[in-house]
Regions:
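A shared catalytic/ligand-binding motif for oxyanion handling
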Residues: 1-113
Length: 113
């Protein structure tokens, strides 16, 4: 299974959406995680449709925050387990075997202590 993670740095530019669509067409990922999307949920639903995905989960940006999104194909059995402004955590169950695996998309800066 292929998953695509992309730091968008904003999807306001139509060219950015076009490049993302080219990546999706080329690699045919079953799951896509986007960070720094800079779009509201309505805008991200449009992007999801342009990328030919059926399912999506969105973490709305707060103020000048960036926001997150995860899209997955119709045939993928994905359940969101938890989320925050920095991550989306999910479990995928494979239909044929019942095998479960975790996928977590996250965005943030490295903190040193």
């Amino acid at each position: 299974m292929i998953a695509l993670c992309w730091n968008c740095r904003g999807l306001g530019n139509p060219r950015s959406v076009g490049v993302l669509r080219e990546c999706v067409q080329r690699w045919d990922p079953k799951v896509v995680f986007l960070s720094e999307k800079k779009k509201n949920i309505t805008g991200m639903k449009r992007v999801k449709v342009k990328l030919d995905f059926v399912n999506g989960f969105y973490v709305q940006r707060k103020g000048k925050g960036w926001g997150l999104a995860m899209f997955w194909r119709k045939e993928i059995n994905l359940e969101i387990k938890s989320y925050s402004k920095h991550r989306i955590d999910a479990v995928i169950t494979e239909e044929a075997t019942g095998f479960k695996w975790r996928i977590t998309g996250f965005y943030g800066h490295l903190e040193t202590h």
